[in-house]
Regions:
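Loop/turn-to-beta-strand initiation segments
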Residues: 49-53, 230-233, 269-273, 310-315
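Conserved catalytic network of the ASCE P-loop NTPase/AAA+ motor domain
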Residues: 17-18, 43-48, 226-228, 263-268, ...
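P-loop NTPase motor domains
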Residues: 59-64, 90, 94-299
Length: 426
């Protein structure tokens, strides 16, 4: 971009320091935040071995403009994609249930208020581990895996065993008599929740697996798609993922990236950045009793604290920084702050900025569209900058209400919208 005080001077940021120390791009809706993200992505895409993942929550970075060299478009499978073969080759991503660790499966399936929850968690983990061990018999992984190991297994078989235990009768004290088994009736509600998940078409990307997603080799191909060194910027369209499991799904993807980096040898580790659009939806400050959001947050807290050691950079993008987790925000050493109109949001950013900025931070509500205050290790001095308009434009531009209302013909295809709403897919 260019400095607001001197438009003849070009403002630069140090790319190494920007991603090494994590960054935050914040701004109220309509402030030019999406343009700023597009500008960063455009510059990254020009690098020969750029490596980043952009979690696109609303599908605004999946427009035609973003289909250029250095940017690859993916989407989480919708109900209409489940029958597609070779999904990875068609840029369709499944997130199989067998990637979930013990805590994530509990958050998704277990009702903490159920008095039988401890028994349900114990027997479920035991059956899952038994099924995983069965799958690695005779391989190099035999006797080495845990319930958290990402090993493919058949969840339907686990459900069948749980149903059997829920109805089990065992020999009684008297000869020929029977009594209720130790888990009889205690797994009923858990089994019902699991059956509901398996039959929920919205969750098909996780539970409706074909043969290819049930193969152990699938994980290697999946990791290559997400993390290969010449992969460029991978935009993952998350717009059709159910909102109630969005934190879990994104947290799982982030955890996989971090874990693969952690287990890679240093000489073969290629740095990768995670760009978290609308981060306040899944890197939340206030979680209350939401187990799914809580477990998803853990991945980002760990990346914020330890990601630098393993070459994982984090870019938090949000219109409501006051709703973003403080632990994660406090680890960001670079801030690109566009106009913020909410007082709470302004105060959060002001508290995170250095004390010696003078009154520059007082201008957060006065900034023009696509104008930002940039502070941090990636810039020599705190600066007020007008961000260049990117050549690739997101589909989030402000809708011209008055102009559209004044047109002669502006019909909306409501039939198509209703059809998409019913089938939960565009």
């Amino acid at each position: 971009g260019k400095y607001t005080m001197d438009e003849s001077s070009i403002a630069y940021m140090d790319g190494d320091k920007l991603f090494q120390r994590h960054a935050a791009i914040v701004g109220s809706t309509g402030s030019g935040k999406s343009f700023c993200v597009a500008c960063v992505v455009e510059q990254m895409a020009k690098l020969k071995h750029s490596n980043a993942i952009l979690f696109d929550i609303h599908g605004e970075y999946s427009s035609t403009d973003f289909k250029i060299d250095g940017i690859k478009q993916y989407k989480i499978a919708t109900p209409g994609d489940l029958a597609t073969s070779e999904k990875l080759n068609n840029n369709i991503l499944m997130v199989p249930y067998w990637l979930l660790n013990y805590e994530e499966m509990q958050a998704l399936l277990l009702d903490r208020s159920d008095q039988n929850a401890p028994n349900q968690a114990m027997i479920f983990s035991r059956e899952v581990l038994a099924e995983k061990e069965k799958g690695v018999e005779g391989t190099i992984y035999e006797h080495l895996i845990t319930v958290d190991s990402p090993v493919a297994y058949d969840l339907q078989t686990v459900l069948t065993r749980l149903k059997s235990k829920d109805e089990e009768m065992v020999p009684g004290a008297r000869a020929g008599s029977e009594k209720l088994g130790p888990y009889n009736g205690k797994l009923t509600r858990f089994n019902q929740r699991l059956e509901n998940k398996l039959s929920d078409k919205r969750m098909g990307f996780m539970f409706s697996l074909q043969t290819e997603e049930k193969s152990q080799n699938w994980l290697k191909d999946f990791a290559r798609v997400l993390m290969k060194a010449d992969g460029g910027v991978k935009v993952i369209d998350m717009s059709e993922v159910p909102s109630d499991v969005l934190p879990l799904v994104i947290g799982l993807l982030a955890r996989i990236v971090f874990t693969v980096q952690q287990w890679s040898s240093m000489e073969h580790r290629h740095p990768i950045a995670l760009l978290c659009d609308e981060a306040h939806l899944y890197v939340q400050q206030s979680i209350s009793q939401d187990a799914v959001a809580e477990i998803g947050l853990k991945s980002f807290e760990r990346i914020a604290k330890e990601g630098r050691k393993y070459g994982v950079g984090l870019v938090i993008i949000s219109q409501r920084p006051s709703e973003v987790n403080r632990t994660v925000l406090s680890q960001c050493n670079n801030f690109i702050s566009l106009r913020l109109t909410n007082v709470d949001d302004q105060n959060v950013i002001k508290r995170l900025l250095p004390d010696n900025l003078g009154n520059i931070a007082d201008n957060l509500s006065l900034l023009d569209i696509a104008e930002a205050i940039i502070v941090g290790d990636a810039t020599l001095l705190p600066s007020r900058v007008k961000i260049n308009e990117p050549s690739i434009k997101p589909s989030s531009q402000t809708v011209p209400f008055w102009s559209i209302w004044g047109k002669d013909n502006s019909d909306q295809d409501l039939s198509e919208a209703i059809c998409n709403m019913i089938k939960q897919s565009k």
